[in-house]
Curated annotation (Swiss-Prot):
It is found in: Cytoplasm. Coiled coil: none annotated. InterPro entries: RecX_HTH_2nd (IPR053924), RecX_HTH_3rd (IPR053925), Regulatory_RecX (IPR003783), WH-like_DNA-bd_sf (IPR036388). Keywords: Cytoplasm. Residues 12-54 are annotated as: Disordered. Modulates RecA activity. Belongs to the RecX family. Residues 13-24 have a biased composition (Basic and acidic residues). This is Regulatory protein RecX.
Length: 182
């Protein structure tokens, strides 16, 4: 459990993770200390010196033991007990981070669901965020297309497609034009 706990601590010290994201990373085999990143375990090594079969069997048994679901569950529980892991905190920080990069509600919600955060926590995090999504959509459009937004339908359609891709709702996109007219 100590190896998995140290992996979890290292991962959580770099950035917040959702529970399912951390669980997935802990279940995956760790990178080799020899620098065998991305190589399959069954692939033949190009090294001229063969590794010791006793060491490789020991490493395989440790990898099986380390990816044991009970060990992972204990590590996850330990992280919750020490307040290192919190899906609500993760969702709030993720929303703030992605909104600063110019993404809208739909895109952020989709990404959070892919990371395994449940809908209730996502909704609560959006309700607690104090982000003006209409203003953000306007800032993103002005950053991409210019300070004065286009008025021709072809150019407006381009702005709309871009903002939809970024995850903004149609109402937020329409509001940037109604605000600029007034």
């Amino acid at each position: 459990m100590n190896d998995q706990l140290s992996r979890a601590m290292r991962l959580l010290s770099q950035r917040d993770h959702s529970e399912s994201e951390l669980r997935r990373k802990l279940a995956a085999p760790p990178f080799s200390a020899k620098g065998n990143w991305g190589k399959r375990s069954g692939a033949k090594s190009s090294n001229l010196v063969e590794s010791n079969p006793v060491e490789s069997n020991l490493a395989e048994s440790n990898a099986i033991e380390e990816s044991d679901p009970q060990v992972i569950e204990q590590v996850i529980d330990y992280c919750y007990q020490h307040n290192w892991l919190d899906d609500s905190r993760f969702a709030a920080s993720y929303i703030n981070s992605r909104s600063r990069k110019g993404y809208g509600v739909q895109r952020i919600r989709s990404e959070l669901m892919q990371k395994g955060v449940d809908k209730e926590r996502i909704l609560a995090a959006f309700e607690n965020s104090e982000i003006d999504w209409c203003q953000l959509a306007k800032e993103v459009a002005q950053r991409k297309f210019s300070e004065t937004l286009p008025v021709e339908w072809k150019e407006k359609a381009k702005v709309q497609r871009y903002l939809l891709y970024r995850g903004f709702f149609q109402e937020e996109i329409q509001s940037i034009y109604t605000d600029s007219v007034e």
